[in-house]
Amino acid sequence: MSASSLLDKQCDHFSTKIVDLIMVDKADELDRRVAAAFSEREASRERRISQISGECNAGLACKRLADGRFPEISAGQRVAVLSAYIYVGEEILRWILEPEASVRTRVSGLVAIDLAPSCMDISRAQLLQTMNLLSGKRCAPSDLSHFVAISISETARSRTLQMAPYEEGSLKSVTGFTVIIEEAVPFDMVAYGRNLMLKASAGSFPTIDLLYDYRLFLDKCSDSGRIGFFPEDVPRPKVAVIGAGISGLVVASELLHAGVDDVTIYEAGDRVGGKLWSHAFKDAPGVVAEMGAMRFPPAASCLFFFLERYGLSSMRPFPNPGTVDTDLVYEGCRYMWKAGQQPPKLFHRVYSGWHAFLKDGFLEGDIVLASPDAITEALKSGDIRRAHDSWQIWLNRFGRESFSSAIERIFLGTHPPGGETWSFPHDWDLFKLMGIGSGGFGPVFESGFTEILRLVINGYEENQRMCSEGISELPRRIASQVVNGVSVSQRIRHVQVRAIEKEKTKIKIRLKSGISELYDKVVVTSGLANIQLRHCLTCDTTIFRAPVNQAVDNSHMTGSSKLFLLTERKFWFDHMLPSCVLMDGFAKAVYCLDYEPQDPNGKGLVLISYTWEDDSHKLLAVPDKKERLCLLRDAISKSFPVFAQHLVPACADYDQNVVQHDWLTDENAGGRFKLNRRGEDFYSEELFFQALDTTNDTGVYLAGCSCSFTGGWVEGAIQTACNAVCAIIHNCGGILAKDNPLKHPWKRYNYRNRN
């Protein structure tokens, strides 16, 4: 039976027609009018049933009532009728209501659920997650733009899921009913209209562990140009900032704008920027090798605030796997992955499974954990309670899982996302190679699962960009700004700080030269290894509480190595070779980078080796960059000789046109970035909130990405810099801008509560 015939059949049996609510755009009005439509339908049906049963000796068993057109009647007995909603896209809705005669496609297996389109407790992403799990299909957000309200018999085939969380951690039951539009089934269409459930809004949004939008705070402060200020009668503090990375420079700059004139920055190295380090080549000034941070997602909204402030808006996509032509090398065989398409067949199961996980979350028994996409949408739509409760459930259930054990639990269990159970070790190894969007994650498989998941939820794996002018241009421009006649860079002293100690009400800085100086406040951004070993801040509880000391001493810093090669030409364009190569051998990840797209004859840049952890540690045995390059080139040539033959430095100059760096042996870094092991999220909490702890203020404040929830990302460095600045202004009698992080009513998580 066609949809139009079904609609006609319904109209023949009772006078109430399906109600058009397309123009209703307010949730409360939609709720009221849908309820009215159901009430009118129920009254009309009751009159019709009474009429037919009264005319027939068989009563409720009358054949006219048992033909499947009345949801209230089953086997001659009255049954309950439930309200449910079919969610469809605009095209399918139009097909259901006004089909053309030529359309014969069967619309079957549609699922109706008991969640109303006016429900504000459920987001579109959660609806999508629920529909995918109940229907077993892959719905897109556009497939849920409209609804058809139906009355359906309680005898209809159904399945119930428990959505976690709901209202401060409780569960919400969601029941789905399978319906077939073209058959006489026990349901009636009552009304149709637009889905008004919450959907994500544009603009910045808070990170999942903080639920506070630092970008919004910075935007609000833009008009005045400062985070806070000091009244004329309040003395300004004398402040030392340890480290001239992005965090230290933001601290110094914001303090100067707030009116703190006596600011000194101590930097142990010979450059500014810390891990924002762009190496420029003599033979190609417009080409830069990003030795530290190199991928910048728009979701890192604080970073983009400062990029825009200092006129660095030129960005282009980073050539991540699958976004450009990519070769995947597995067990000596090459598999080509065309840009924007599905990966090779060998990788379909892990690729589809991971992307299903992002949309559908994880079904454990009959309890559904919110999908990463649903949590992100809750953040974007301002549904902070939903985001908090959803993330707390993940922390409770997976906080003690490593990335490795969580992948095993999710994809090798009874309800794997995508419907296909992964095999071990085959799919396991494929996933290690392919990764989650930005390359293979095999080397960090033993890090905490929630440490990786938060990056996904925060949007840091999406739409990653590279900075055309080199990211170190940002710290350079911050350092070059002049405040009260003196540039920030003039306040930098390139000398190593050996110790930071309390001396009565002051903080004493002891320098490598033997000189000591006293300050009112000190902000330490120099990294965890220096805080523990050089500054000796964790020897006792004079400066920091014991839990903070423990976090500094025990947080895991990741080793990372990079080797860049400047080539005579952009050979990958000349010879139609892939811009990205992922390998399961020694080389791991190769990226071809074009910093001068306007010049097709310009120099090329290849990141021939970007490795983490054990893969990086092995390279430390080969410190000579020419020897290391030769080993990498030989490894690549075994499976991809056509590509490897072009890996020769421009002008055969290995000294100038090959650069490498090992962050683990960098004496001023002690590792590339903090990456928590399983069960160690509470370390990040201790480090991040240290500066905001007004009850334990000693005058020394931590900042930097390693003291945040997002180690290795510029966002965490800026967030903690804001914390330190606010703490100093507030604790020294200054006045902060409204809605600042110090006065924010933080909704904290329980990182130690494990089920």
From Swiss-Prot:
Binds 1 FMN per subunit. Pathway: Plant hormone metabolism; auxin biosynthesis. GO terms for biological process: auxin biosynthetic process. It is an enzyme of class 1 (oxidoreductase). Gene3D superfamilies: 1.10.405.40, 3.90.660.10, FAD/NAD(P)-binding domain (3.50.50.60). Keywords: Auxin biosynthesis, Crown gall tumor, Flavoprotein, FMN, Monooxygenase, Oxidoreductase, Plasmid. It catalyses: L-tryptophan + O2 = indole-3-acetamide + CO2 + H2O. GO terms for molecular function: tryptophan 2-monooxygenase activity. FMN binds at residues 247, 267, 275, 295. Substrate binds at residue 295. The keyword Ligase does not apply. Its cofactor is FMN. InterPro entries: Amino_oxidase, FAD/NAD-bd_sf, Flavin_monoamine_oxidase, Glycosidase, Trp_2-mOase. Belongs to the tryptophan 2-monooxygenase family. This is Tryptophan 2-monooxygenase.
